[in-house]
Amino acid sequence: MSTKDFNLDLVSVSKKDSGASPRITSISLCTPGCKTGALMGCNMKTATCNCSIHVSK
């Protein structure tokens, strides 16, 4: 079987690129009204509880 049989869009990374930062970072700034934090979202009573997720390129 050849390695060209399947194209999975994999990218090879060299060791010199090991200092790269993650592309997705998240910051949770929820108030006590958010029962379960950023994973479950905000409580209905506190729709603006300042939950946020930052995605960088």
From Swiss-Prot:
GO MF terms held by the record: signaling receptor binding
Cellular component annotations (GO), alphabetically ordered: extracellular region
Gene Ontology annotations of biological process type: defense response to bacterium; killing of cells of another organism
Alphabetical UniProt keywords: Antibiotic, Antimicrobial, Bacteriocin, Lantibiotic, Thioether bond
Cross-link Lanthionine (Ser-Cys) residue location(s): S26-C30
Modified-residue entries (2,3-didehydroalanine (Ser)), positions: S28, S56
Propeptide regions on this chain: 1-23
PTM comment text: Maturation of lantibiotics involves the enzymatic conversion of Thr, and Ser into dehydrated AA and the formation of thioether bonds with cysteine. This is followed by membrane translocation and cleavage of the modified precursor.
InterPro entries found in the cross-reference section: Lantibiotic_typ-A_Bacillales
Crosslink site: Beta-methyllanthionine (Thr-Cys): T31-C34, T36-C42, T46-C49, T48-C51
Post-translational modification 2,3-didehydrobutyrine, affected residues: T25
Family: Belongs to the type A lantibiotic family.
Function text: Lanthionine-containing peptide antibiotic (lantibiotic) active on Gram-positive bacteria. The bactericidal activity of lantibiotics is based on depolarization of energized bacterial cytoplasmic membranes, initiated by the formation of aqueous transmembrane pores.
Name assigned to this protein: Lantibiotic nisin-Z
Name of encoding gene: nisZ
